[in-house]
Amino acid sequence: MTIIVTGAAGFIGANIVKGLNERGETDIIAVDNLTRADKFKNIVDCQISDYLDKTDFVERFARGEFGKVRAIFHEGACSDTMETDGRYMMDNNYRYSLAVMRACLDQGVQFLYASSAATYGASETFREEPEFERPLNVYGYSKLLFDQVVRRVMLTALSQIVGFRYFNVYGPREQHKGRMASVAFHNFNQFRSEGTVKLFGEYNGYPQGGQMRDFVSVEDVVKVNLFFFDNPDKSGIFNLGTGRAQPFNDIATTVMNTLRGAEGKPALSTEELAQEGLIEYVKFPDALRGKYQCFTQADQSRLRAAGYTAPFLTVQEGVERYCQWLLKQPV
């Protein structure tokens, strides 16, 4: 039975396609926009049955042109939190998602989609409840508005609808994202090219490099998606993070020590790296003041209650694995 992945050449979408392949699934229709042609590299080692441009997909799916479809993993979106074109953001993230969901409901197709922890914005509590949702940018609002519609639709839906509020995801196949790629990716490239890593200095009560995020490996993101794919009776909106906030210092230290280890050099503590000038703390940029999440940490209660019991990788585990993968890629 056919599976459809939108955003299939993007970061999370490509990893989901690869994860499905590893389970023997190859009847996969990949949907994306390859205006950025280099994104093809994300799925060059994947097996798919067809590729469609996103502009052609929704109407054809709504007409039932693809026969019996089991599920759609809807990962396609504009994920640039600095995007200021609100009309583009709402059309791409909200209107398009509505059309995909409605077609799924009409045909009884499982609908698993990407929401975001950006829906919480300035909140200090990260639980899937309306009182904690205060997005700081139009990206977060576009995701929240769709979540709000989903909450109403789920009351009467006869097929699965699952939204995943992704926290700070890192891992393979994100190189096309540019400035929106993970901190781990940028730290890796900066240390290799410059021999140092730059982190934000003190801001909003947090020490240098001490701003904390829930960094989650894309390996775990794929596992959670596939868990719900295997359990079509479970619907809801779920946080997808480790439940453990870690400072940016941990990312930088893990990246640098992995690269040092590859050169036969000993591991150093964060303090030692800073003392040797290998970590450089820079003034927090004025452009981000008031628009920046200094702390995120997923409340996993709802995810665990749904039956997902597997442990999540720590930054030290996941980032080291990611760096080892990056080291094997062609320069």
Curated annotation (Swiss-Prot):
Keywords: Carbohydrate metabolism, Isomerase, NADP. Its cofactor is NADP(+). GO terms for biological process: ADP-L-glycero-beta-D-manno-heptose biosynthetic process; carbohydrate metabolic process. NADP(+) binds at residues 11-12, 32-33, 39, 54, 75-79, 92, 143, 169, 177. The active site is at Y139 (proton acceptor), K177 (proton acceptor). The keyword NADP applies. Binds 1 NADP(+) per subunit. Pathway: Nucleotide-sugar biosynthesis; ADP-L-glycero-beta-D-manno-heptose biosynthesis; ADP-L-glycero-beta-D-manno-heptose from D-glycero-beta-D-manno-heptose 7-phosphate: step 4/4. It catalyses: ADP-D-glycero-beta-D-manno-heptose = ADP-L-glycero-beta-D-manno-heptose. InterPro entries: Epimerase_deHydtase, Heptose_epim, NAD(P)-bd_dom_sf. GO terms for molecular function: ADP-glyceromanno-heptose 6-epimerase activity; NADP binding. Pfam families: Epimerase. Substrate binds at N168, R179, H186, F200, G201, E202, Y203, R213, Y292. Its EC number is 5.1.3.20. Homopentamer. NCBIfam families: heptose_epim. Contains a large N-terminal NADP-binding domain, and a smaller C-terminal substrate-binding domain. Belongs to the NAD(P)-dependent epimerase/dehydratase family. HldD subfamily. Catalyzes the interconversion between ADP-D-glycero-beta-D-manno-heptose and ADP-L-glycero-beta-D-manno-heptose via an epimerization at carbon 6 of the heptose. This is ADP-L-glycero-D-manno-heptose-6-epimerase.
